[in-house]
Amino acid sequence: MNINATILGQAIAFTLFVLCCMKYVWPPLISIIEKRQQEIADNIKFIETTKKDLEKAKEEATKHLINIKLKAQDIIEQANKNKLQLIIEAKNEADITRKKILAQAQKQIETERKIAYEELRLQVIQLVILSTEKILENSIDKNLNSKIIDKILAKI
């Protein structure tokens, strides 16, 4: 066999092989590659939209956190105001109670003082009466004694 004929036969066989591959093998491979390219493109678009959605979600979360922090600060400030108001009310109530207790104590002291004064006055009167009786028993001049008794009673 001649080398030229062999090369020519191999070239024909190769051409037939390439034609068969182009007709039966190449189209499914191309369609698989195109499908894969389309899937990759779709995945890239999905990733980009997901990134955008994630950025929007992050921004919304940040705004939401800022709003929550502001609300928390407002709540804390309101609680502090309420605390101060309660403290002021408690102080005022304590002052009112203290004043009532002091007034009651002063009334009680005044009442006890009057009672003690009255008891002392009664004791003095009894002593005067006893001393008067003794003077009268021992005394001869009743006019003088009555003047003394009248003076003592007038002083009481």
UniProtKB/Swiss-Prot annotation:
Residue intervals passing through the bilayer: 7-26
Keywords (A to Z) from UniProt: ATP synthesis, Cell membrane, CF(0), Hydrogen ion transport, Ion transport, Membrane, Transmembrane, Transmembrane helix, Transport
InterPro entries: ATP_synth_B-like_membr_sf, ATP_synth_b/b'su_bac/chlpt, ATP_synth_F0_bsu_bac, ATP_synthase_B_chain
Subcellular location: Cell membrane
Membrane topology: Single-pass membrane protein
Major location category of this protein: membrane
GO cellular component, one term: proton-transporting ATP synthase complex
Disulphide linkage map: none
Pfam families, per the entry: ATP-synt_B (PF00430)
Gene Ontology MF annotations: proton-transporting ATP synthase activity, rotational mechanism; proton-transporting ATPase activity, rotational mechanism
Statement: the UniProt record of this protein carries the keyword Transmembrane: yes
Gene3D superfamilies (UniProt xref): 6.10.250.1580
Family according to the record: Belongs to the ATPase B chain family.
Biological role: F(1)F(0) ATP synthase produces ATP from ADP in the presence of a proton or sodium gradient. F-type ATPases consist of two structural domains, F(1) containing the extramembraneous catalytic core and F(0) containing the membrane proton channel, linked together by a central stalk and a peripheral stalk. During catalysis, ATP synthesis in the catalytic domain of F(1) is coupled via a rotary mechanism of the central stalk subunits to proton translocation. Component of the F(0) channel, it forms part of the peripheral stalk, linking F(1) to F(0).
Self-association and partners: F-type ATPases have 2 components, F(1) - the catalytic core - and F(0) - the membrane proton channel. F(1) has five subunits: alpha(3), beta(3), gamma(1), delta(1), epsilon(1). F(0) has three main subunits: a(1), b(2) and c(10-14). The alpha and beta chains form an alternating ring which encloses part of the gamma chain. F(1) is attached to F(0) by a central stalk formed by the gamma and epsilon chains, while a peripheral stalk is formed by the delta and b chains.
Protein name: ATP synthase subunit b
Organism field: Baumannia cicadellinicola subsp. Homalodisca coagulata
Gene: atpF
